[in-house]
Amino acid sequence: MPRSMKNDNFIDKTFTVMADLILKLLPGVSSEQKKAFAYYRDGMAAQSEGEYAEALENYREALALEQGEEDRSYILYNMGLIYQSNGELDKALEYYHQALELNPRLCSALNNIAVLLHHKGELSLQAGDEETAEALFNEAAQYWIRAIRIAPNNYIEAQNWLKTTGRANLEVY
């Protein structure tokens, strides 16, 4: 039984049953696509329970089967989330960048890249490397600006940071 069916949550079980029914009824959905979706769904279930190794395994299987670029971008993004949660920031950045290559309008990936770059900038500042910190802050600003241009009502803290640091070279309203 797939992990997603083991969940005791009624809403999750209902979603899983509905998703399975939709997949069965949709014409043109290959068995590979169905398998990819099942692995992705099981990866999300494992990730939500903090079972990151299992989630990554499912995401890798889904990635091997999935053909659609947008769907692949979300798989890569979720893998980045896991690496970020585990403190593997450089690896998380790699996965977020891969997700953006497939889906340049994935705001959450843009935001997470900016957050990680800002964090690295703070670490550089603490280490006394102001030049590297400034470069990282400027790079973070560029990612936040891209995200804000796509979703102007989001990332209010980032917008405030951009304004207070003089890096806001855009009008979003």
Curated annotation (Swiss-Prot):
Keywords: Membrane, Photosynthesis, Repeat, Thylakoid, TPR repeat. TPR repeats lie at residues 36-69, 73-106, 121-154. Belongs to the Ycf3 family. It is a peripheral membrane protein. It comes from the Bacteria. Essential for the assembly of the photosystem I (PSI) complex. May act as a chaperone-like factor to guide the assembly of the PSI subunits. Pfam families: TPR_1 (PF00515), TPR_8 (PF13181). GO terms for biological process: photosynthesis. It is found in: Cellular thylakoid membrane. One of its GO terms (cellular component) is plasma membrane-derived thylakoid membrane. This is Photosystem I assembly protein Ycf3.
